[in-house]
């Protein structure tokens, strides 16, 4: 089984690093989409099936937190898990994100083994639904 993945980060370099890390971690990727902010996520999701989202917190137009809140209101978070990938990450901030419905948090720089384990855990949870 492969996953349609959406990477959300305003840095083209970070999006590239996440793509390469997915490859190094042997995550089975189907279609791969990239956008620069949370608003674009909503647009992509309206016309494509997305299995998993990797998102930054600090982005222009619509931040990762605003995106999560909007997805929660629309009940899309129930169907599409979000993994936050950020350098930001106090315990309080991470707990707040998890309460909003984020499934996991990865700190930059990303460790391929940690990414693989989190994807397996998160997607295993969703595949059982």
Please name every model-derived segment.
Residues 59:
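Receiver (REC) domain active-site loop signature in two-component systems and cognate sites
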Residues 43, 65-78:
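Short amphipathic alpha-helix used as the core "switch/output" element in two-component signaling
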Residues 34-43, 64:
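Helix N-cap/capping motif at the beta->alpha junctions
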Residues 12-33, 100:
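Two-component/phosphorelay signaling modules centered on CheY-like receiver
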Residues 48-54:
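Active-site beta3 strand of CheY-like receiver
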Residues 66, 89-104, 117:
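Alpha4 helix (beta4-alpha4-beta5 surface) of REC/receiver domains from two-component response regulators
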Residues 110-119:
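C-terminal output helix
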